[in-house]
């Protein structure tokens, strides 16, 4: 047996947009397999499970509902197979019978190779939309601290069996226009208005907040 299961993997966009059926199989299938494995352990009631969900589950979040709350209804954007798979996977954990679970709905992950991700998804953001990014380092720290703080007894029973939105904090809340400026500036390029036609960017049906 084990004490903790941290399920942080999954098939995400843009690969999820190109291969929707594989995305469903991967994300939902993984959740089902993990739940079965946990429940099959002799100490199943003692195992604590953390599942990383996504704010994409609450769909399009343009102004004035651009900042999300944990209690917001699930409303997946049109054609967002990734978010659909995450909703079903999340439900799989919640309804599995696992005694202690927690769902962390993560925002966009900021990682060093994001500049190499040359895909049409770069235009699938409202230029005046906002996002609170979460760095890959903070994601790792969260998982580490979850285990360490629980072992110290700092996470009470009221922490488990709940949903939480997670991000890297106030300093990582930025408009998509500002984010484009930072990315392009890193490459020594002019601002987005100099390189892109505003009509290339969508106006709605984005899944960030």
What is the predicted role of each segment?
Residues 7, 11, 32-79:
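Conserved Rossmann-fold NAD(P)-dependent oxidoreductase catalytic core, especially the SDR/UDP-sugar
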Residues 84, 125-152:
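Substrate-positioning beta->alpha
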Residues 24-31, 35-38, 50, 85-86, ...:
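Short alpha-helix in the Rossmann-fold core of NAD(P)-dependent oxidoreductases
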Residues 15-22, 60-64, 114-115:
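Conserved catalytic-core motifs of eukaryotic protein kinase domains, centered on the activation segment
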Residues 7, 48-53, 102-108, 132, ...:
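Structural signature of the Rossmann-like NAD(P)-dependent dehydrogenase/reductase core
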Residues 1-26:
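NAD(P)H-binding glycine-rich loop region in Rossmannoid oxidoreductase-like domains
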Residues 142-208:
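Mid/C-terminal beta-alpha module of Rossmann-like enzyme folds, strongest
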Residues 53, 89-113:
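Conserved beta-loop-beta element that borders a ligand/cofactor-binding pocket
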């Amino acid at each position: 047996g084990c004490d903790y299961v941290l399920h942080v993997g999954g098939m995400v966009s843009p690969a999820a947009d190109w291969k929707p059926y594989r995305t469903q199989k991967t994300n939902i299938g993984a959740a089902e397999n993990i739940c079965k494995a946990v429940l099959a352990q002799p100490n199943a009631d003692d195992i604590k499970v953390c599942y990383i969900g996504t704010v994409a589950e609450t769909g399009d979040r343009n102004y004035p509902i651009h900042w999300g709350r944990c209690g917001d209804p699930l409303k997946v954007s049109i054609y967002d197979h990734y978010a659909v798979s995450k909703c079903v996977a999340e439900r799989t954990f919640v309804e599995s019978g696992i005694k202690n679970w927690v769902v962390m709905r993560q925002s966009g992950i900021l990682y060093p190779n994001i500049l190499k991700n040359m895909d049409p998804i770069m235009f699938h953001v409202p230029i005046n939309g906002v996002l609170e990014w979460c760095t890959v380092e903070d994601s790792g720290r969260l998982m580490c601290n979850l285990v360490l703080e629980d072992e110290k007894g700092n996470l009470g029973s009221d922490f488990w069996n709940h949903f939480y939105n997670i991000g890297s904090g106030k300093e990582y809340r930025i408009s998509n226009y500002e984010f484009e400026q930072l990315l392009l500036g890193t490459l020594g390029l002019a601002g987005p208005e100099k390189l892109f036609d505003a009509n290339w960017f969508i106006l709605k049906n984005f899944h960030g907040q």
